[in-house]
Amino acid sequence: MFNFEKLEVWQEAINFADTVYTITRTFPETEKFGLTNQMRRAAVSISSNLAEGSSRSSRPDFARFVEIATGSLFEVISQATISKRQGFLSEVGFNQMYSACEKQSKMLGGLRRSLLESPS
């Protein structure tokens, strides 16, 4: 097992990507290369950046990848809002995704703070 796989925040990011894939399966076929693809790519980017960042030799470098992962998470929030407004995402689906985003955001913020506050 790689070290990043032991991180609870990485495990939660994988779960979040699963949630995004499940929810976007219900989107119209016309969005296959639009919001569906964008949301999935952004969701996958979260765990990918955590994995890549964990390989860096310094804590500030890892923290930068956590920051990028957070940006990807915020992309998903924006895309979910658009999806809801367009009628592709139900209120229940949106709330489920938003709640998962809030949890993931707190975890990413905590990891970033710990990386920047700890000695290298």
Residue positions per predicted region:
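Amphipathic alpha-helical assembly/interaction segments
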Residues: M1-S120
